[in-house]
């Protein structure tokens, strides 16, 4: 049958209704494009707004072909008068298109009413129906903007998309046209009239290519579908063979498609599947099948398989840098945990800077001055530098206490509404913790890890004490000191629970045992000489916070009985792995990288991920922020303090015993090792002198600030990001600062801060901050901390001071809050962030708090 898509220059809905009513008008019908086959009827169609099964046009009226002489109008590219349409209307066929719809909107008994009268009385309903159902263009502009502005693109796209009922979008069809021919004809001007428009569409030589293009497009569509199904299959094969977190899975799928459909590859594929005039229509697009999926395997999946395999991962991606030297003058804590008395000093946060100042004053002329604050204080506690006074070596630390001649630890103890800081050289750990009594009640024989853990008894307390001597053994935190060697890896894990998770004893211990297997295998790759069947790893779990109400809904009694953990939000775990005697890790960055490596390795273990995926929301479990100098971490056996009333204790870190196979016979020794304070401190004291240091542990596929998937994305797009220094210089030049050649690196950032960054940040703070906060920024000066952080200091009466809290108006309102500007590069612009650290518990104890940010205008580089 002959089908034509038509348009009008007046509202098509009204024109169609007049034709159905057989009411002649002066309006013309313009046949835009025709699919011609010999038939008795001509079906006049319009494009629908919605399409089912890729049918994009529907008939609005039918004419008798012979009486209309439709070929005459097509041959001469002439519009058809609506009067001629009415005279040639096939009334029966046209009535069948509308009769059911009309009868549903008129009273019963209207079946015998003449069709044109029925249309006339339902005129408004039909106009609304036509308007809602069809696209009703009245000018060439719509067709040109939708299907293409060149003659070839317009006609080939329109013919295939409207008539062939294929599952291809307009954009896809346009791509097929470009692959079919590079000769797309002349531009069609958008200001042409409808008569000029059909003169192009009905007389174009591109009509001769309708059939061959349609056959090619169908073959191209089949090839594309096969290609993408194969590509999907390759992506899924790898995705199902490894256990990825939800976020990583999404990123993997994104990067896989981006890699396979990278611009140059897609151009190559399009050229490969372009129309070949030397081949028959049915043999088009058959060359080099599955090129995209096969290229994905070589460019990404083979690399991913290496990265997601435990053995090849360590061999190809993990780089460890060591240094062996028997003459290392590296000192650990000299800290006696079995002393008859505690040798410990207790100070508050205000006294830290005062004590640093005291050491600077007494050591003036002998020692380099230390920066005031917690970091400077930690440096004093770790420093082994000494001078001779009266023939005796004296360290700067001895100005704190004459017995502190060696490096010592520093702890934070949480009291009611405040924190105290303790440092010293001796304590009675076992006696004060009551461990001597605990060891007496251990079972005689090892039965299982579960039974050993359940029979291990610790004396509990519920209320916070006002005595520091007692609280020292209840709420103690170790403060990480990067100036000291690390002798134990301490991992802090938070496992966010699914709402329906039920943690049974068998499931929890299976999880811990599998974690131990993953970690000990990795540990053996780092330290090949250890015996992994005898090497200890110590686990602690935060006690459930609501034991009195184990499972409050949708569980049966047996499930309540077997529930081991009744936490609702997350499981908190602490893992301690002793570093072999004589070896230490230096700095915080290797520990952060090690945590990322452990997190990645856990995802590679099939059995472990099955358990984790059933009860938790997968993600990065290890907290890497604990390895920054000055950050503190709660020790094993210690409690949390209820933040609401600051009187109650909860969430004690209790030991979970996962005994190595070769230690099960002498399991008491393993328990004793887990109770040893020196095995659960970052910088615990070990017997042997340090002769080997590890100063770098690095995942070569993941630079410090990027994940593996981020690195792959960056490689894919080859985005070269400007350095902070380059952008600072450019901003200064743009703002009229020409004399920058003599500026050092330090001076450059300081000049940029004073001249550009701070004025904009100050303006924003004045506009958006409360007056109490904004007034603190009226007179400030700047100190450079590192290559991207500037510290702010208040300048008052010629003296420098820190700020009072920017977030809360604390009791006492002390000026001990550290405030910083951080600079981040985002493509060709700089992001400036104002943040602070407040020592109070309400402000999360020295954690980073971001207050505001300013984004500078992008530069043309």
Swiss-Prot record:
Location in the cell: Host nucleus
UniProt lists the family membership as follows:
Belongs to the herpesviridae DNA primase family.
What organism is this sequence from?
A: Human herpesvirus 7 (strain JI)
Instruction: Reply yes or no: does the keyword Zinc apply.
Output: yes
Q: Which gene encodes it?
A: U43
| Single GO cellular component term | host cell nucleus
* EC primary class: transferase
What is this enzyme's EC?
2.7.7.-
Q: Output this protein's name.
A: DNA primase
Record bears the keyword Transcription: no
> What are the protein's UniProt keywords?
DNA replication, Host nucleus, Metal-binding, Transferase, Zinc, Zinc-finger
Q: Subunit details for this protein?
A: Associates with the helicase and the primase-associated factor to form the helicase-primase factor.
According to UniProt, residues marked as the site described as Essential for primase activity are 492, 494
What's this protein's function? Essential component of the helicase/primase complex. Unwinds the DNA at the replication forks and generates single-stranded DNA for both leading and lagging strand synthesis. The primase initiates primer synthesis and thereby produces large amount of short RNA primers on the lagging strand that the polymerase elongates using dNTPs.
Ranges annotated as CHC2-type zinc finger: 805-843
